[in-house]
Structure formats: C-alpha cells, structure tokens
Amino acid sequence: MPIDLLTRRAALMSLGAFASVGLAGCNATPTAGVQPGATPPPGLRIGVVNIDNSPLVAYVGNPTAQWAQQALPGALAQAFGARMAPGDPGAVPLDIRLDTLYLGNGGPADPDRMRGVATLGGHSISVRADSTYIANPTDQALPEQALQGRVQALAVAFAYRLKRKLGA
C-alpha cells in the first residue's frame, strides 16, 4: 500500500509542477527600465518619448493599439539602454506615430508586422518591423495573453529596427 501511495503522490506532484510551468509562460513580459545611475554614452541621447497611436486605433482598434502604446516605451528602453535620458535637458525628444499593426496567421510565410514613423531632432524615419509567430498550445487557452505577447514582441522588434536605422 505505501508503494501505491508514493506513486500517486509522485503523479500528483508531477502534474502540479507541469501545470504551474505551463501557466508560468503566460505571465506578461516585464518591461525594461533605464537604470537611474547609468551614464549615457556620448552622442545621441533620447529624452521624452511621445507615442501617437491614433492612426493605429483607427486601423486595429483597442485593446491592440493600447497594448502597442504600453509596450513600446519599455522596448525602447531595452533597445537604447543608457542612451535614454528622460531628465536630461539636452536630450532630444522622440516622437513615434504608429500607423499599422498586422497580426499574421503564424510562421515565416505570414509574419506579424508593425509600421510607423519616428521623428527625432526634426528628422522623420519610416520604421517597419516584422516578428515571426509560432503557435503555442497555451495560445488557445489564453488567446488574449497570446495576442498581447505578440504585440510586445512586435514592439521590441520595432525598437531594435529603429535603433539600427539611427545607427545607435
């Protein structure tokens, strides 16, 4: 009898561990922040980030446009790191207008896409970002979190694409 009990306990513990690991992947991705004591490298310094998502609201509606607006500042902080200087009076403001966001059907044949225009120091830069989505079994159970994760991945791709275009 103790052998059967141990086997049941082991089965229940492994099932519980498997369920918790599966649900842990559904947590929202933490946004990156700028370290307060970080000294910016010489050159480009970005001050205030203004995001205009009104064209995106008209294109895809809420909550998708709101997710993009919320995810982009953290993605920019992750991509630009110490070049973000929100309190620096000499830093240049970055204005971003998000125009379109398309969530594809998945895979490399139909990637997710985000397009917008970034204005930095009076110069406008057209930015296009792509992100490949691979379906996950938990996406069917938690579709809203899956869509939000895809928008966050697009925001990160957008930020790094902007960084590449700026040469920073």
PLM-predicted stretches and their roles:
Residues 2-25:
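N-terminal secretory signal peptides and thylakoid transit peptides that target proteins
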Residues 77, 81, 85, 103, ...:
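Sec-exported extracytoplasmic/periplasmic mature domains
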Residues 40-97:
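N-terminal segment of the mature soluble domain
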Residues 82-126, 132-145:
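Surface-exposed short loop/turn segments
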Residues 22-43:
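Bacterial Sec signal peptide processing site at the extreme N-terminus
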Residues 38, 156, 168:
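Surface-exposed interaction regions that form or flank ligand-binding interfaces
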Residues 27-29, 54-56, 89-91, 109, ...:
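Intrinsically disordered, low-complexity proline-rich regions
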Residues 57-62, 66, 124-165:
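Short secondary-structure boundary motifs at beta->alpha junctions and helix caps
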